[in-house]
């Protein structure tokens, strides 16, 4: 197979694209082919166009506000299913992203996040053209410490380049491992072996397929992803997580991000520069904290789904509720890092610098509100996790899964949320007030929603009574008292109705 790198590709990254294309040879060797894939650079004087279907081309584009960094479409023979052509597109914003990684996290000749990112992105898109789908469970192969140890991971710290993996960052005091995978993972090699090895017998295929429940080969794709609140059940199938202990990894990641945010003025606010990059990087890192915590929230009410053949893998069950201890650990991290009074606190001098460049184009959505919209930002991050935990499907699953092992019931879940959101004697920040009000609205809405089961509704009813009692307070400043009076009125009205 020959893949051509379009001649419009920036010269400095061409070697990385070539490396990403030919990186698949490691997998094809397992299938019995040596040098199965070759990458070539399209000559500047080529007499053929990159859009010519006769050529498999990795093209380069600069689309305004692209949704993805790359696309890996292919053309298949409708009669046989055979893939006959590939036309990969990679976006210029991928290079910008790589240089941002360098600027934030540093780089060396031996460990360059820009190089690894482009190699990984290219391998991912080439993988699609070879017939592979996304595998979002692949990140669960190593624990939160092993994932940084290249002596264990080699050139791939996840099970597949077909995952949507974030940049891998080692916490303070730990050597930096791979930023991104630069070779096929165990799942990739296994899938290519199954799909491309010539002359496989039925017994050979059965033997290969029997490995599907082993940790290095587990698979979950888009239709199983827990990306939106209440959708799907297996927390391993989440886009953008890392390690088989996402709780520990997320706790480490938040410390790393918080430390880096404090360094942003020294990195970006230098002579002759506007604060645009400073602003966008601050928002990006803050949202990243929310995304990781959102992934942790999926453990609450989660069920591991293992697709097995009944006469094989008898030591594995199709459904396994996430252990109680892990759900409680997940809740504790969410309480401390997402819902607590000091989960989001910002230096006023820092915030004053969050100015964007003035653009000539009119933006109807902003309507001149160019000041930092921090409360919307924080509530959006908190609300996403809360929306998942309180989703009627998740509440029902907590109850249903109690029949096969779950012991973390809705009443305890809501009690833990109450303890984090309403703290006796605490003067809530304005961020916390927003959270409290939104949480109360969510409970009131749930109480009147027929999609909730009766056990969950009774827990919601009980929690609202606790909030009604809590908000009869006389301490705090005027803003606090007015806020709690309003919450008390909302809850009382809902319960009376």
Locate the predicted segments by residue:
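Solvent-exposed, polar/charged alpha-helical surfaces in well-ordered, non-transmembrane soluble domains
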Residues: 15-22, 26, 116, 120, ...
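Short loop/turn segments at secondary-structure transitions that flank enzyme active sites
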Residues: 9, 64-66, 92-96, 136-138, ...
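The catalytic-center signature of Zn2+-dependent metalloproteases
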Residues: 41-61, 116-173
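Fold-level signature of zinc-dependent metallopeptidase catalytic domains
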Residues: 1-48, 109, 497
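Conserved catalytic/binding loops enriched for acidic/polar residues
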Residues: 139-497
């Amino acid at each position: 197979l020959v893949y051509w790198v379009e001649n419009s590709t920036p010269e400095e990254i061409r070697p990385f694209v070539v490396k990403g294309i030919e990186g698949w040879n490691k997998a094809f060797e397992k299938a019995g082919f040596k040098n199965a894939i070759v990458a070539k650079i399209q000559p500047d004087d080529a007499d053929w166009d990159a859009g010519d279907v006769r050529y498999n081309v990795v093209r380069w584009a600069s689309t305004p506000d692209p949704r993805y960094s790359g696309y890996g479409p292919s053309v298949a023979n409708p009669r046989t299913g055979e893939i006959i052509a590939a036309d990969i597109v990679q976006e210029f914003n991928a290079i910008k992203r790589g240089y941002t990684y360098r600027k934030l996290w540093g780089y060396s000749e031996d460990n360059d996040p820009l190089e690894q990112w482009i190699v990984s992105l290219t391998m991912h898109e080439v993988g699609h053209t070879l017939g592979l789908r996304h595998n979002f469970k692949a990140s669960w192969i190593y624990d939160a410490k092993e994932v940084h140890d290249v002596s264990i991971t080699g050139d791939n710290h996840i099970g597949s380049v077909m995952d949507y993996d974030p940049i891998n960052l080692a916490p303070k005091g730990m050597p930096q491992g791979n930023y991104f995978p630069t070779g096929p993972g165990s799942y990739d090699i296994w899938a290519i072996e199954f799909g491309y090895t010539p002359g496989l017998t039925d017994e050979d295929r059965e033997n290969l397929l029997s490995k599907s429940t082993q940790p290095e080969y587990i698979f979950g794709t888009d239709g199983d992803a827990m990306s939106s609140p209440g959708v799907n059940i297996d927390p391993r199938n989440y886009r953008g997580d890392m390690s088989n202990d996402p709780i520990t990894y997320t706790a480490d990641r938040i410390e790393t991000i918080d430390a880096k945010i404090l360094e942003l003025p020294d990195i970006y606010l230098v002579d002759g520069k506007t604060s645009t990059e400073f602003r966008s990087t601050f928002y990006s890192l803050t949202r990243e904290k929310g995304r990781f915590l959102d992934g942790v929230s999926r453990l609450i009410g989660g069920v591991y789904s293992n697709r097995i053949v009944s006469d094989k893998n008898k030591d594995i069950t199709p459904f396994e509720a996430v252990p109680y201890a892990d759900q409680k650990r997940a809740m504790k991290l969410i309480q401390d890092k997402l819902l607590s009074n000091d989960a989001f606190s910002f230096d006023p001098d820092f915030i004053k610098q969050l100015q964007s460049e003035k653009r000539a184009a009119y933006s109807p959505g902003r309507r001149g509100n160019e000041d930092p919209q921090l409360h919307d930002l924080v509530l959006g991050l908190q609300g996403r996790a809360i929306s998942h935990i309180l989703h009627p499907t998740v509440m029902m699953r907590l109850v249903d899964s109690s029949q096969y092992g779950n012991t973390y019931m809705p009443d305890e879940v809501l009690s833990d949320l109450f303890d984090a959101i309403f703290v006796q004697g605490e003067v809530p920040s304005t961020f916390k007030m927003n959270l409290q009000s939104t949480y109360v609205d969510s409970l009131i809405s749930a109480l009147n929603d027929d999609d909730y089961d009766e056990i969950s509704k009774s827990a919601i009813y009980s929690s609202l009574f606790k909030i009604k009692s809590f908000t009869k307070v006389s301490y705090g400043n005027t803003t606090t008292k007015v806020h709690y009076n309003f919450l008390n009125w909302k809850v009382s009205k809902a319960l009376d109705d």
